[in-house]
Curated annotation (Swiss-Prot):
SGS domain ranges (all copies): 260-350
Outcome when changing residue 221 to E: Diminishes the interaction with barley HSP90
Ranges of the TPR repeats in the UniProt entry: 2-35, 37-69, 71-103
Keyword field: Immunity, Innate immunity, Plant defense, Repeat, TPR repeat, Ubl conjugation pathway
Quaternary structure (record): Interacts with RAR1. Forms a ternary complex with RAR1 and barley HSP90.
Lineage: Eukaryota, Viridiplantae, Streptophyta, Embryophyta, Tracheophyta
Protein name as annotated: Protein SGT1 homolog A
Length: 350
């Protein structure tokens, strides 16, 4: 049955009926979710519809299912080039070319990527400050494009060197979460059996360093850390929603421009919405490591540079048993491990 649907999808694709092709491939995937061919072919239909982030996600899934499927690398490279993700595209195309050296399409697209990367580097005029401010007040948490059809709420906040995206999805097993990072792409896919899949696949406001990005699946949410390629303040999470600015010390949160979305509905009170989000975060009941991480993060975000250095040094040197914010106290000595009352410190030899 799945193959019959895929055959009909191919016929629709040939007839330039790409929406129907996507729908039929999706039904085939529901019946056979481990077929890499279906994902690679749906990626091609998405490319025709100019849904490039969806195409990248499908190509990544096809590669995960079958790393030797050459056309999956071709689809990923093509979609990434459309998104101006030339380095990510080049990496995918080079991998595909290594599998099938005789395929001329790869060489042609790789040459095009090299040319576009060179042109992009020529156009880079972003000034880099000689010194960075010692303390920067992080912008407030910003609510993102929440629509009535969104399955899970998500939001982000940022620091000078990273953007942290939180998806509030409770009780999701780690194996049901698939997250990919591109040069300027984030792809979050949550697939729970018996439920509609959740997709968060924005083209990001700024470029990131994929190898330094990471994520963690917690009991109440998924936390994603995006390492910024440039030390700039993102005006939003998504591309094209405002100019980038260099961070300034102690910028008032009142100056931060909040996102406005075209709508026929009553204008939202973003100050009230932000207060509600912060209250939900504050009231959120976490346990174990998740609670400790939240506590540590909240203190760290509001600390100055000396406090952050003190916290990091004391926590690391004491093996997690001491957390100090006094740099004058801990900066000149080694912090010994101090077990809680009633517990004994033991050293293990391997």
């Amino acid at each position: 049955m799945a193959k019959e649907l895929a055959d009909k999808a191919k016929e629709a694709f040939v007839d330039d009926d790409f929406d129907v092709a996507v729908d039929l491939y999706s039904k085939a995937i529901d019946l056979d979710p481990n077929c890499a061919e279906f994902f690679a072919d749906r990626a091609q239909a998405y490319i025709k519809l100019e849904s490039f982030t969806e195409a990248v996600a499908d190509a990544n899934k096809a590669i995960e299912l079958d790393p030797s499927l050459t056309k999956a690398y071709l689809r990923k490279g093509t979609a990434c080039m459309k998104l101006e993700e030339y380095r990510t595209a080049k990496t995918a195309l080079e991998k595909g070319a290594s599998i099938t050296p005789s395929e001329s399409k790869f060489k042609k697209l790789i040459d095009e990527c090299n040319f576009l990367i060179t042109e992009e580097e020529k156009d880079l005029v972003q000034p880099v400050p000689s010194t960075l401010p010692s303390s920067v007040t992080a912008p407030p948490v910003s609510e993102l494009d929440v629509t009535p059809t969104a399955k899970y709420r998500h939001e982000y906040y940022q620091k000078p060197e990273e953007v942290v995206v939180t998806v509030f999805a409770k009780g999701i097993p780690k194996q049901n979460v698939n997250i990919d990072f591109g040069e300027q792409i984030l792809s979050v896919v949550i697939e729970v059996p018996g439920e509609d899949a959740y997709y968060l696949q924005p083209r990001l406001f700024g470029k990131i360093i994929p190898d330094k990005c990471k994520y963690e699946v917690l009991s109440t949410k998924i936390e994603i850390c995006l390492a910024k390629a440039d030390i700039i303040t993102w005006a939003s999470l998504e591309h094209g929603k405002g100019p980038a600015v260099l961070p300034k010390p102690n910028v008032s949160s009142e100056v931060s421009q909040r996102p406005a979305y075209p709508s026929s509905k009553k204008v939202k009170d973003w100050d009230k919405l932000e207060a509600e989000v912060k209250k939900q975060e504050k009231d959120e009941k976490l346990e174990g490591d998740a609670a400790l991480n939240k506590f540590f993060r909240e203190i760290y975000q509001n600390a100055d540079e000396d406090m952050r250095r003190a916290m990091s040094k004391s926590f690391v040197e004491s093996n997690g048993t001491v957390l100090s914010t006094n740099w004058q106290e801990v900066g000149t000595k080694t912090i010994e491990s101090t077990p809680p009352d009633g517990m004994e410190l033991k050293k293990w030899e391997i």
